[in-house]
Amino acid sequence: MSNSRNNRVMVEGVGARVVRGPDWKWGKQDGGEGHVGTVRSFESPEEVVVVWDNGTAANYRCSGAYDLRILDSAPTGIKHDGTMCDTCRQQPIIGIRWKCAECTNYDLCTVCYHGDKHHLRHRFYRITTPGSERVLLESRRKSKKITARGIFAGARVVRGVDWQWEDQDGGNGRRGKVTEIQDWSASSPHSAAYVLWDNGAKNLYRVGFEGMSDLKCVQDAKGGSFYRDHCPVLGEQNGNRNPGGLQIGDLVNIDLDLEIVQSLQHGHGGWTDGMFETLTTTGTVCGIDEDHDIVVQYPSGNRWTFNPAVLTKANIVRSGDAAQGAEGGTSQFQVGDLVQVCYDLERIKLLQRGHGEWAEAMLPTLGKVGRVQQIYSDSDLKVEVCGTSWTYNPAAVSKVASAGSAISNASGERLSQLLKKLFETQESGDLNEELVKAAANGDVAKVEDLLKRPDVDVNGQCAGHTAMQAASQNGHVDILKLLLKQNVDVEAEDKDGDRAVHHAAFGDEGAVIEVLHRGSADLNARNKRRQTPLHIAVNKGHLQVVKTLLDFGCHPSLQDSEGDTPLHDAISKKRDDILAVLLEAGADVTITNNNGFNALHHAALRGNPSAMRVLLSKLPRPWIVDEKKDDGYTALHLAALNNHVEVAELLVHQGNANLDIQNVNQQTALHLAVERQHTQIVRLLVRAGAKLDIQDKDGDTPLHEALRHHTLSQLRQLQDMQDVGKVDAAWEPSKNTLIMGLGTQGAEKKSAASIACFLAANGADLSIRNKKGQSPLDLCPDPNLCKALAKCHKEKVSGQVGSRSPSMISNDSETLEECMVCSDMKRDTLFGPCGHIATCSLCSPRVKKCLICKEQVQSRTKIEECVVCSDKKAAVLFQPCGHMCACENCANLMKKCVQCRAVVERRVPFIMCCGGKSSEDATDDISSGNIPVLQKDKDNTNVNADVQKLQQQLQDIKEQTMCPVCLDRLKNMIFLCGHGTCQLCGDRMSECPICRKAIERRILLY
């Protein structure tokens, strides 16, 4: 590997952590001064790709102009063997070495140097790589210090561009918090971040290791301060020279006797017979290895490694420069000199190593004449040739004599014409570049001057952008007005199809959008991803720009290439404020994206309760809450499937969602919740009145699903136990017992069994058979669970609390009065707000959720004696106030709670608060419940007829308003023939699907 390659990988290496440099001109792409990024790769010798911690990735200059500084090169793995940081004792120092210039043998690592260790008045040498030149710096006491920001401890992050860890974070868009910056490996310090995700998972992720960026910060954190001007500039070539004076590209000879050469070669590559060619031939230095031995290439193509003491730099005389040689350390060229590039492709490739490197784009410059623009400190030349600028090894070019000297007048005239043509072209390009740069920087005076020039192109581009686009993104309204007076093309597109209005939306420039609107810019313009400016403003979170666009009539519901509307994007970005603004502007909730999700589906899928709350509060038509996807899933199905409890609660209680809608597999939301063992969703749906006996396409009810899941989990556990070791004969008699007892082991089994019991206790039919002829009990091999299910179902159906024997009641009462935690003390603590009594006062502080209903415990009240008679303990819960302050005898006499004076609407006995049933209340409930049930059955006939009528009317309305092509979305685009479709289908058509006339114009409906 050549020395330049070593330096580029290590000094300017992949993985280095960087900040903006001295020639930075890219605004806030990095997030602002002090924000940190990671070197990802090198596009060319002059361009480096950086991924900033905020997620932005772009190319930056690292030759000629320097956009970046290296904050910390430790992640690249560069190490200074034999050194030690005298403060933190890191050994060896990895990254940049800082050596005190005033103390003997005192070194610091990067962290300690910027952390103000050692004397601040002392000056230091900066040593970027082993063997590189030492750079003397000013004392830190006199230098400017700024704060680093990005992915540091405390930052909030999401997955980044190199994420490959599946759903460790809980899913795309889920957030986590960086707790510490750590080492990904021992040889790559500070190259990883330890993250605690919001879902509770935690792990180490790459931030710099091999250029990888697993994370992107959504809320940066401070990472300490650093001395900006002391950080090396990324791309400066300080390390290409060898201590012996040789550098890559130098021509060398061997002038010593054979015996001496052979002696010097010991330990430096040795000597072989094939090396005799080197004694009489000039070679070219093509590399310098880690031991500072020199790798030389010869015309034969062979490469040999030499001790530097063997080689002598060749003294080459150029044509047109007979009096000057290449030695002496001073350049033979001056700025403005005309030079001719070498014709030999292979030779120039070799010479360019370590001198700007070779790029295929340089091919047109071979043999061409150019002008020296700049001479670097290492004598490399920046040459303007063929309309571009390249860095060349001085050995790769030769001076061109003037027209009045050695060459003929005719040749001089031809050369003059060539150069004139060359630089006229370059001047024209520079003029457009200056205009774009001046517009981007807000330089009104310069823009005015440039616009007065007749040869300026007001629509000319620099780096793919026009002056209009640059001014729009940076908010320079005065320049926009100047450009509009020059009849600038406001609809000009960049390589991504973005127009000026897109750039204004990206830059959060509402005033610019107002100016562009007055200039007749299309606010609904689409880029190559079919995004409108509104899409971009929503994605960037620019609320004011969103309002401005909508105020000026921007369509709120156009779809991008993925079918997403701005509503979808606002939900994904969790911007409820923007979501509300879009809905106020009439954004269509029913439009579905390419995956079939409308806004409600999307919010349910994402588990975004705040967005769901906003959507439900502003639904234009209440039945939209039950809209189905192509697969029959409603928003409630999606919430149940993904265990988004808050979203499901909103859909049930606020949206009044139909609980019994079936998907294409005829599954209800309850089927899905039971199948996935989502206990809270099951409880919610059952208590809200979901039907328990609806059958899916296989004839299974939710109870079938629960018991099948329970049995399968038992079999899996049995298989696991058998995998550990063979079951011997002694186990055979008890195998059935083992299977039956598995139901009590493991949370998964408990969950399935408890769901089954809950369904049975709420009236699920145990006798319904599926298409295989199986009842729920046929799927349950556990006799104990079967008995429990039968008992729960029987109690629900017959209300047999009153028929139970006194001994059973007595035993049940004793059990119900025991603390559910310790079983030693009696229950004496009332949980609020649920009103259950589950533990004693000693155990209650340890309980976060009620052990009976699983609701969050917000208050704990110890049950004292009756406040009226003081003879017995309080034993009746008053509703709705939730106080328990009187015994049974006294409570029956009260019409108001003696504690809060609220009217008592219901009295709940102590035993019911413990999870049991009161015989008295059970009888009352049954007797009072019979008549409404019968009445409800009578009413159902009339209700069903009304519902069928309304459904038919709704179907008629849908046929009139739905797109005739996809039958999913509302018509919102009309053609000149009078027919219409939805916007997504209309964009893809060239003729009307109804009358087959060619589509001349598409008109969007508002």
UniProtKB/Swiss-Prot annotation:
One Pfam family recorded for the sequence: SH3_15
Modified residues (Phosphoserine): S408
Protein name: E3 ubiquitin-protein ligase MIB1
Effect of R174H: Found in a patient with severe intellectual disability, psychomotor delay, no speech, sleep disturbances, feeding problems, abnormal breething, deep-set eyes and short philtrum
Residues binding Zn(2+) 2, per UniProt: C100, C103, H118, H122
GO molecular function, one term: zinc ion binding
Entry binding sites for Zn(2+) 1: C85, C88, C109, C112
Pathway participation: Protein modification; protein ubiquitination
Subunit relationships: Interacts with CEP131 and PCM1.
Coiled-coil features, chain-numbered ranges: 935-962
InterPro entries for the chain: Ankyrin_rpt (IPR002110), Ankyrin_rpt-contain_sf (IPR036770), MIB1/2_ZZ (IPR042056), Mib_Herc2 (IPR010606), Mib_Herc2_sf (IPR037252), SH3_15 (IPR040847), Znf_RING (IPR001841), Znf_RING/FYVE/PHD (IPR013083)
Keyword Disulfide bond found: no
UniProt key word Thylakoid: no
Mapped ANK repeat ranges: 430-460, 463-492, 496-525, 529-558, 562-591, 595-627, 631-661, 665-694, 698-729
Miscellaneous comment in the UniProt entry for this protein: In epilepsy brain tissue, levels of expression are increased in the cytoplasm and microsomal fractions (endoplasmic reticulum).
SMART domains, sorted: ANK, RING, ZnF_ZZ
UniProt note on tissues of expression: Widely expressed at low level. Expressed at higher level in spinal cord, ovary, whole brain, and all specific brain regions examined.
Enzyme class of the recorded protein, top EC level: transferase
Organism: Homo sapiens (Human)
ZnF (RING-type) residues: 819-854, 866-901, 963-996
Single GO biological process annotation from the record: endocytosis
Role according to the record: E3 ubiquitin-protein ligase that mediates ubiquitination of Delta receptors, which act as ligands of Notch proteins. Positively regulates the Delta-mediated Notch signaling by ubiquitinating the intracellular domain of Delta, leading to endocytosis of Delta receptors. Probably mediates ubiquitination and subsequent proteasomal degradation of DAPK1, thereby antagonizing anti-apoptotic effects of DAPK1 to promote TNF-induced apoptosis. Involved in ubiquitination of centriolar satellite CEP131, CEP290 and PCM1 proteins and hence inhibits primary cilium formation in proliferating cells.
Record's catalysed reaction(s): S-ubiquitinyl-[E2 ubiquitin-conjugating enzyme]-L-cysteine + [acceptor protein]-L-lysine = [E2 ubiquitin-conjugating enzyme]-L-cysteine + N(6)-ubiquitinyl-[acceptor protein]-L-lysine
EC number: 2.3.2.27
Residue ranges crossing the lipid bilayer per the database entry: none
GO cellular component, one term: cytosol
Modifications after synthesis and translation: Ubiquitinated; possibly via autoubiquitination. Ubiquitinated; this modification is inhibited in response to cellular stress, such as ultraviolet light (UV) radiation or heat shock.
